[in-house]
Each structure stands twice: as structure tokens, then as C-alpha cells.
Amino acid sequence: MTSSGKIRIYELSRDLHLENKDVLDAANKLSISAKSHSSSISDEDATKIKKLLLAQKSSNSSSPPAKQKPNKEILTLKKAITSPPTKSEANAKTNASLDKTSSLKNKPASPKKEIPTSPKPPSAAKQRVDAIKKPTPSISKNNSLKVQPTIKKPSLVSPKQPNIPSPPIAPNKGIKPTIKRQDSNNENLETNKTKAKPNIVSKPQARQIKQSSDLINRSPKTSPKQPIQEIQTNKPKAPQRPIAPPPRPKVQSQFNQKPGNNNLRGGPNQRKGIPQGAPSGQPGSTKHPRNLPTGSYKGNRVELVGAPIRRNTKPDNGGRGARDGNFRQGGPNQGPPISRQGGARRQEGGGGRGQQMRPRTGMPPGMRKPVAPGELMQLQKPTSSATPPIKRGDLNKGPKKDGISTAKPPANRPTPSAAPKRPPARTGAPGSSRKRKPDWDDAAKLEALRNKSPQKQRQKVHIIGENDDALTAETSGFAGGGQAVVLSASLARPGKPKASKKSGSKPTGALRKRKKESTRQRQRRRAMELRAAREAKQIRPEMIVVPEDNITVQELADKLSVESSEIIKSLFFKGITATVTQSLDLSTIETVAEEFGVPVLQDDIEEAAKKTVEMIEETDIKHLTRRPPVVTVMGHVDHGKTSLLDAIRKARVAAGEAGGITQHIGAYQVEVEHEKKLRTLTFLDTPGHEAFTAMRARGTKVTDVAVLVVAADDGVRPQTLEAISHARAAKVPIVVAINKIDKEGASPDRVKQELSEQELVAEEWGGDVVMMPVSAIKGENIDKLLEMILLVTEVEDLQANPARLAKGTVIEAHLDKAKGPVATLLVQNGTLKAGDVVAAGPVLGKVRAMVDENGKRLKEAGPSCPVEALGFNEVPTAGDEFEVYPDEKSARSVVGERASDARATRLAQQMASRRVSLSAMSGQVNDGDLKELNLILKADVQGSVEAILGSLEQLPKDEVQVRVLLSAPGEITETDVDLAAASGAVIIGFNTSMASGAKKAADANSVDVRDYEVIYKLLEDIQLAMEGLLEPDLVEEKIGEAEVRAIFTIGKSAVAGCYITNGKLQRNCKVRVKRADQIVFNGDLDSLRRNKDVVKDVSSGFECGIGCDRFANWKEGDTIEGYKLVTQRRKLNT
């Protein structure tokens, strides 16, 4: 009792004559905070605990034990009992009998190892007995002698020892072979009080009496109706595992049976870790306690009998209380095996021992391999001799008697020095992860145990605590010096099983192995992988697609399938220092790619070819009818696209085009007779020049079939590849027309071969692409080409709903000075009528008139019909989708949203184009290097404006910047002239005219206005204008050469008499004096005389005198070169 009115746990347990663990368990049940035996609790809590413990005692003594959970009982085989005696009689008889024999018997005889246990004071043990359940079977006095050996001793088998078999030890003659049955618990208390020295517990010895073997054979015949007693554990919900083997049919006892102290809590002998079995004064009792177990020999087999353990009474309805035969280890219905001798494997009753050793795999039910004293890691060092391990298969071979499975002893038994390593604990087995609780009450007993137990070197004594794992899982992983070590359940806590260690160490090793790779090694490995990947794809691409944003040198190298160092070297030779992470603009990318022979296509242009809007809606499905196909003619410039269309239309459009090239999208409808029916085809003629990429993309976007025109004498060219990519992006079928087959050098097969490299394989070569050789000039195979086009379009299900409001795409748009904004529309669904309200992107309009390609006015236009519509409030953007709305209000709301978005996009583009570094600009201005060419661009159609702007972007801008202040389709107005005068810009007109007053204003303000019809000339003049802004270069121009033939000295200077061999020499010109191919002077010619007369120049074939103020070291044979510096127009650096 503390001064504060509290009481400690160990004081309460002492008053109640109970273990600390019992009191702690009771406190936990009552939710009273008590962590250890030294914890303090209040008097009120102590009273509650006392009441609970007293109630448990009374209930345990009066009621049968509760059924415990499966796989957690400690099962002990007992003799079938005829009539239950009283508890006091049974306990008194057993203990008295055990007390007498344990003090006299059992000298160790075989290398059976013993597991020592920790000591306990007699008083504590006595109190524990009271707390243990005591209903025991009734045993008559006549059967007491016979039952004792059967209940108490296990029949364990020891393997055969081939090297050094131990002879049987003669029994002690001073002891009678018979023993009267007494209460084992009382006997333990008496023994512990009388012994002055701890007894040594050797292996269980078989009794010599005949009755022992007979009773052992009969012991399994336990009636299911007769309950077997079992110790009531402190934790009733933690059943134990069976640890003892079943009895053998015959036991030949050569020694007197040693019952041992089988009280579950054990006495002080067990506490100190010293084996029991012989009194302190008896000779030989402690002579070889760890090397030789006691037992009886039968041949080379040692037969051991375990100590009895009382079992709880179990009901016979399928429980574990009374089962016989081959039971499944750890199963829910376990038979009662015989317990092992010694207190090391004590039950839960007083000590709280939660787990027991599990039987080996392959052993008979209930059989457990004996443990030799030499296997105790912390108490005994192993000896040097070794024997083979026990064969588990031998343990299964045993006779059966009366339905009870009995074990046959193995042939060999290992010596203590070479005990076989036990396998790792079986995961999932019952009891493999149960917690153990310590069997001591204070640190003094633990210290005494350590001092008394010799330890192996470098092996630590592990004390089992409350949170420790099961003994079976832990003892299997310990081995010292190549030998397996079996630890005492009371004293040692082994490490984790080997299997778990290995499995746990593997991930760690893998992690360490990964960490060993340094950054340089990882980079080297990545470089090797990339190099291998590049080597695998050495084939250079035919064309690369560059995104709208800039790409880095490394990305360009990957696209070109070359090393980045090659790109850097190419840029270095062009005066550009770059790294692998530096971004490149489009012009630089095109220049580098051109060196490697790969054309470049912008990704945004390819995206423009993709069909983004579905023209047919769900409401149109019921009203769909067949529509004419839209055919786009594509190909490289001058490959004959327009001539082919002229041959189809029987017209002469190409002759009327400026420069003989197409610069607009021409939309035509042609009626063709097919299968005695007139079929309509809509053709779109796209420009082939490289500047009109966007036009080609728009043409592909609305097409159903792409006709790829390739000249038979020229083959596949860059724009041909671009057209192929557009067609593939739009996912439309391709029909190849191999044109100009009538020209010399035409090779259609070579064209097919080149196209097959682009995965376009002709049908006659086993592919699926239609290729038709034609001649547009002579009209050869034109009908066959049209027929093939119709066949291809028939495969495509081309339908539209003409009974709805029109939807389509703006093919082209321009500003006409008489008609205003004009848009070429292709109706793709529905019917467009005059007077419809049309919204084309951010532009709103009302169709005032429609005309076809021949200028014929139309009232309506159905699906796949191209028309020119008038009535827009401004020029729409080519490529936008248009849609007809039922009223102007709904159309205006849609257009307003689009206009705001377009305005924001346009502003962002302008800001991006004008974004420049302030420091770079100021430096260029100071050096005079900043040159700008301001332009105002007016063209006939929107597509031409786009083409010109795209071409201007590709011009070099390192020294001269081109700024387009205004670009729009339409005629040149007076407003444009005023803007050009204010900004010093040049007005560029493309296929357009000047409005009234614009010419006069341009002359008044000295504004340069240029008008062009061919895009080639326009781009050439703009480049010349940019070069004109550059400072001219000074270059040397050689004018003559003279030879020194005489030297005249005049005062301090000297004059060279020369003969003009080439050209002429002028006074004050630059001269260079060479002597033996070395320049000795470079300067001005100051004096030139001929016959003492000063002259301006001397021509070839005459003699003259030459003097230089800064040079007088003339020698005969010198060569004088005369030259002058002239300015030369600079070229743009490309």
C-alpha cells in the first residue's frame, strides 16, 4: 500500500496468492489501467479485482470449463477414467506420488535434450493451484498405479544413433517400480518445499513395471463421454496447441518412471533453468544433465514418457475433449496427445504461456520431436559430434491399437551437437503468430537466470515478452556453428524464420542494386539505348511534320533520324551556335532539313486538312439522297493539274492564267456519262506552288476523292508528298493520274516505284491504289480516269439532305471593286438559296446573288455545288464553315461570339509577331544594323493573301525585318496610300487594281506602289528591296600590274622605274608590292610620272616612274599590283 492510498499489483497478487498476470488480466477485463506488476491502482479498483477473481474461482470450481477456440488448446492424452473421484483426493494422491519419485529417480541416460524452466516460489505455486480449474477424472485406488505413467509421461521416439549408441541405464534399485497416484499439484508444492537444491529434469524415463506399458497401450481408450481435465488458462480465449505425441502400444521400462514436477506453474527448479528429476544429494543426478537424457532403450530406440497435464472437461459433441485417433494438427477437433516432461513447456494456467511447440510435418498425430539439452542456445554449447537428422517418414510408421494412432520410434536420434535445423515456421499455421508473456515477476529472477546459464559466444539471451512471436515460428530460425538450436520457451526469443529473412532481404538487395547506378551510368545507358534505336531506324523519312511551335535541335535530330551533333555541326557552318536544347525557327529547320534532303511540312497546315465538322446531322438521316462527289486535283507545280481539268472540261483555262500557273482554287462541275447516265462531278483545282499550301489543305478538307497528278518525266516531288499527307489527314481515297506520258523520258513505272515507297502501291502491283497513265495534252485515257473516279466514289456512301438549310465551306474569298466581298462557297449539305442569311465564321451576310463558274446566275445551289455568293458585310476567311440561319437575329448572336474570339486571336498573333527583345533592338539601332521594310499588301482573294504572307515568313530576317502593316483582299484605296505615306511603307498589289484617287494620292505623297500578277516576281522584288536596305560591301577590283626594272634615288626617297605589263595604273590608286610571293607593301600610289611629266594613268606597254611616300625599299623584280575599292550590293544571308 502506497502512501497515497493506492496498492500495487504485485501486493494485491501476494495477498490473493495469485500470479501478477492473473491480477493484470482481471484489471484488463475491468478496464483498469495497469501496465505492469509495479503499477498502482486505487483501493476501489483493487476491491473490484478481488471480487472478480473470487467469482472466477468459484465459477471455475463449480462449472465445467467453457469451450475454447480451435487450434489453441494444449492437449494431453489421459487414461480413460471409470469413476471421477473428488478433486482434493485426486490432487493429493498425484502430488504425493510425484514428490516421492521425483526426489529419487531419473539419471540421464541418452542424448535427449531437456528444456529448463524458470523457478517459482512454492507459495506462488500453491496459490496458483487454487486458481486452476480442478475437475479431474475419478480414479480408483486400484488404478492409481496404472494410470500415473500413462497420463504423465509422453511416449517420444528418439532416432537411431549409428555412431555412439547409448547403453540403457539400470534403474535405481532404491525405488519401487510402482507409484501410487496422488495429486500432481500437491506433490509439486511438497517437492518444492523440501528440495534444497534444484533438480535436473532429464528426458522422461519409462517405468520398469509391466503395468506401465500395458496402461500406455490402453491409455488412448478414453471414452468420449468421460471428460479429460485441462488447466484453465488465464486467457480462456487463447487455446493451445498439442505438443505431446500419442502413446506407444508397448513400452519396455528399464528405468524407474520419473513423474517429475508437472505442476503447470512449476517450482523453483524450473525457474532457475535447471532440469528436474534427481535430488541434490543423489550421485549422478547432475553429472550429465545436458548430454544424456533419461529413458528406456529398446534396441537402439529410446522411449520417453511425458508428464501429465490436466485438461478441461469438454462436451462430447464434436469437441476436442474426448477424441481419439489420428487428429489433424491444429485442427478444430484435436485428440488428447500426451504432454512432454518438464516445466519448460508449461501450460497457460498460472504462467500465461500462450503457445507450444508444434509437431513436425510428417510425424504421427500428436508426436513431437524430443528436444535435447544441447540445443538450448543460451545454456549449453554444442558438442562436436554430429549425426544425421531424423527422418520424418519413419515417424509415421507405427502400429495402431484400439483405433488409436500410435507412434513407432525412429531408427536414429541425433546427437546434441548435430541437431538438424528446423524448417521455418509455417505461415498460417495455428499458433504461429501468438504472443507470449513472461514467466517471471521481477528483474532479480531474470538476472539470476542469466548468471546461472552459460551462453554461447556472440549469442544473446532473448527473453520472451508479451509481444513476442510464437515459439514455433522463432526457434526454427536459430542455428549456431552449423547446428540447429532449440530454445527454451521460458528463456529465449529466437529471431525471425530464415525464410522470412530471405524474403525480406531480397527487396533490400534489389533496392541497393538500383541505387548503385550513378547518374553518369544512367546517362550512358540512355545514350546507348537511343543510339540503338536510331541505328534500328536508319531509313531517313521522306518528309517531317513540324509543329506550329518551334522544336529543339534534339527533336529535329530525332525526326531526321540523325545524331544531334550532325545538326549542331550543320548550324555551326552556317554561323549559328546551338545546343541540343535550343529551339529552332521554321526557316532554320527547313534549311537544315534541306541539307539532308527531307522536306518540311508544318503541323498546323496538316491539321487544316483534317475534317473537323460533320455536315450531316441526326435529323438528316431520314432524308438523305445521293450527292455528286467532290474531287480535288492536287500535285506538284507544273505537273499538269489545270491542263488535266481543261481536258476534262474541254476548256482552255490554263492558257488564260498568269504565268501559266494556278493561283486560286478553281471550282467546276462537269457532267460525265457513266453507264448511259449523266453523272455530275465537282472538281476543285488547287495551286501547286509551294506558297499555296493552305489552299491545298482547304481543298482536301472538303473533298471526297483526291486525284494526285504526277508528271511521268519528273516523278514524286515535295508538293506531291505534301498532297499525299493532306489526303491521308483528311482520310480520303487517292486516285493517281500519271500525266505527260507522251513526253520524252516519261517513265510511269518509275513513278509507281517512287509512290510505292510512300505506301501507295498500284493495283497491278498488288496494292489498292488506282493509278492511270494519262496525257492531258492529247486527251489519252481521260475517259478511263473519270470512270475510275466514279467507281471509287461509288464505294464511298456520299449522301446529303437537300431539304434543309445549307451548310458548307468557304473555298475562296476576295473583294471585288464592283461587287464588294465575294466568297466562293461549296455547299456540302442542304440547299443554298438567294436571300438566305449566312454566317461564315465571324462574318455575317445575306445572299444577294449567286453565280456558277461560268458566270450564270443561280437561284439555288444543292449539295456539292460550288457557287460565288455576294452580300457579305466583309470578306470572309477562306476555309471557314458557313451555315444558313432561319433569321438574322440568331445568326448575329452567333457571329458576335465568333467575332470576339477572332479579334482576340488576331491581337495575340500581332503581339507575338512584334515581340522583340528591347536590349537587342537598342543594340541594333546603335550599330545601325536594324533595318525594317514596311509593306501594305492587297490581293484579289483571301487565299492569295495567305500565300504571300506565308512566303514572306520564310525570307531571312537576320538583318532586315519585314513588317506587314496591312494585308487584305481588295483594291488599293486612298486610305492605304495615306497609311503607307505615314509609315514609309511600300504598297504591294497582287492581281488587283487601284481605286479612284489612290493613284493621285500615291504620286502626291511619293508612295511606291507595285502591282504583280505572278507570285514569283512579287517575292523576288521584295527580297531585292530587303537587300537594298543593307549596307553595301567594299570589294577590291584589280586595275593593272607593273614590273620594277630600275631604281632611282632622289634625295631621301627612291623611285621605281616600271613597265606596265597588264591593265593600267592610276595615280592615287591602291597598290600592293609583292616580292617572291610575299607582300612587302600595301598602300597608296602617290606619284606617277612618264618622261618626267606627271600623268593620271599609264596604260599597258608603257614605262613610268612610281613613287610612294611611305615606301622606298624598292628592288628590281618586284611586282606592283594596282587595284581600287568598289561597293557591291549585299545579299541576304540565307
Curated annotation (Swiss-Prot):
PROSITE patterns, sorted: G_TR_2, IF2
Key word Transferase present: no
Ranges for region G3: 685-688
Compartments where located: Cytoplasm
Binding positions (GTP): 635-642, 685-689, 739-742
Gene Ontology MF terms in the entry: GTP binding; GTPase activity; translation initiation factor activity
Compositional bias of kind Basic residues: 495-504, 511-524
Keyword Glycoprotein (UniProt): no
Pfam family, one: EF-G_D2
Protein name in the entry: Translation initiation factor IF-2
G5, as annotated region: 775-777
Annotated stretches, region: G1: 635-642
Function noted in UniProt: One of the essential components for the initiation of protein synthesis. Protects formylmethionyl-tRNA from spontaneous hydrolysis and promotes its binding to the 30S ribosomal subunits. Also involved in the hydrolysis of GTP during the formation of the 70S ribosomal complex.
Bias kind Basic and acidic residues: ranges: 391-403, 438-450
Keywords: Cytoplasm, GTP-binding, Initiation factor, Nucleotide-binding, Protein biosynthesis
Superkingdom: Bacteria
Organism: Prochlorococcus marinus (strain SARG / CCMP1375 / SS120)
